[in-house]
Amino acid sequence: MQATATTLNSEQENAPVNSRNKVVVASLIGTAIEFFDFYIYATAAVIVFPHIFFPQGDPTAATLQSLATFAIAFVARPIGSALFGHFGDRVGRKVTLVASLLTMGISTVAIGLLPTYETIGILAPLLLALARFGQGLGLGGEWGGAALLATENAPPRKRALYGSFPQLGAPIGFFFANGTFLLLSWLLTDEQFMTWGWRIPFIFSAVLVLIGLYVRVSLHETPVFAKVAAAKKQVKIPLGTLLTKHVRVTVLGTFIMLATYTLFYIMTVYSMTFSTTPAPVGLGLPRNEVLWMLMMAVIGFGVMVPIAGLLADRFGRRPSMIVITSLIILFALFVFPPLLGSGNPALVMAYLLIGLSLMGLTFGPMGALLPELFPTEVRYTGASFSYNVSSILGASVAPYIATWLQANYGLQYVGIYLAAMAALTLIALLLTHETRHQSL
C-alpha cells in the first residue's frame, strides 16, 4: 500500500508541467469567446435576426421569436455542463476543453454562414435555433474546464490569482465585441450591415477558436486530475454523485454566482437598452456614445479581476466575497438609481464604471471559489453545473425583470431587485466554509 502511494506521488511529481503563459491563454480564450458571442448574438437578435430569419409580419412578434433563440443557450448550458462535466471528470480536463471549444466555435461560425428565411424558408430559423443550442452546449462545458485548468495548475498560495485568468476573458471578449460593432458602424452603411456585415463578428470568432485549439492541444493534463486517474478514483456518473452526495455545496455555489450574473446583465443588456431607448421611457442617448462608455467601463472590469484574485489569496475567498457582495448591495440601493436616472452622460459613465468594476471584483475570485467547493472526482461537473444553473436564475431573466420593474414602478426598484439577488449571494457565502487552504 505504501509502495502504491509512493508510486502515485512520484507520478504526480514527474508529470509534465504546463507553463504559466500557456495556462493563461488556454484558460481565458474560451471565456473571451463566450462573452464575445454573448454580446454579438444579443445585438444581432434585436437588430438583425427579426428581419432576416423570421417571416415578415408583426415586428414585435418577430423580435420576440428572435430573442427566444437567444434564450435557448441558457437551457442548453446546464445540459452542456452535465455532458462535458461527465467526460471532464472521467476522461480528463484537456480533451474535454478541446471538445467544448470546438463545439462552441463550430456553432458560432455556423451562425455567420446561415442562409436567410428568404433563401430557405422555415429551415432558416430552425437552423439558427440549432446553432444557438450548440453554442450553449459548448459554453456549458467551457467555463468549468477553464477554471479547473487554471486552478489545478496553480501553486497552492496563488490559486485565486490563477483562477482569475479565465475570468479575464470576460472583459476581453466584451471589449472586442463592442469594438467590432463600433468599427462596423463606421465602415458600413446600415444596408450593408443588415445584408452581410452582421456576419463578420460570427465568422471572425473562428480566429479566436483556432488560437484556443492550438494552445489547448499542446497542454498536458492537470497534475491534480492525473493523480486521480492514476489511482483510478474517477466516479462512474459524476452528475449522479454530485446530486446525491454534494447537493448542499451545489446549491450554495449556484447562489454564490447569482449576484455576479444579475449585476453583469443589468450593467450591460439592461443599461444599453434603457440608455438608448428614446425619452421619456429611456434616456435617449446615442447608441455609439453608450458603446464607447461601455468599452471604457469594461477596462475597469478587466483591471479589477486580477486584483480580486490577489485579495482572495491574501484574505480568503469568503471574507473577500462577503465585503464585495455587501458593496454591490450598497451600490444597487444608493448609487444605481441617481446616477443612471440622471441622464447626464458623465454620471451614466460613472455608474457604468463603478458597476462594472464591482463586476470584476465579484467575478475574479469565482475561478477559484467554485472549483474549490468540490472534490476532484466531481469538480468539473460541480463547478460547471453551479455556474450554468445560476445563469438561468440570474442572467436569463435579469434584463426582462429590470425592464418590467422600471416601466411599472421606477428605476429604484431595479436597484432593489439587484440588491435582493446580492442578498441571496451574501446568505450563501455566510453558509459556505473558507476554501483558501483546502488541498485540491
For the regions a language model picked out, list residue spans one by one.
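Glycine-rich segments within core transmembrane alpha-helices of 12-TM secondary carriers
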Residues: 161-185, 387-398
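C-terminal ends and interior cores of transmembrane alpha-helices
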Residues: 102-120, 326-342
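Multi-pass alpha-helical transporter architecture, strongest
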Residues: 212-219, 421-440
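C-terminal transmembrane helical hairpin of 12-TM major facilitator-type secondary transporters
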Residues: 318-365
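Central cavity-lining transmembrane alpha-helices of secondary-active solute carriers
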Residues: 67-86, 105-107, 295-308
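Extracellular/periplasmic helix-loop-helix junction of adjacent transmembrane segments
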Residues: 45-77
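Extracytoplasmic gate region of multi-pass secondary transporters
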Residues: 42-43, 246-301, 394-398
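Cytoplasmic membrane-interface "Motif A"-like loop-to-helix N-cap segments
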Residues: 90-102, 314-326
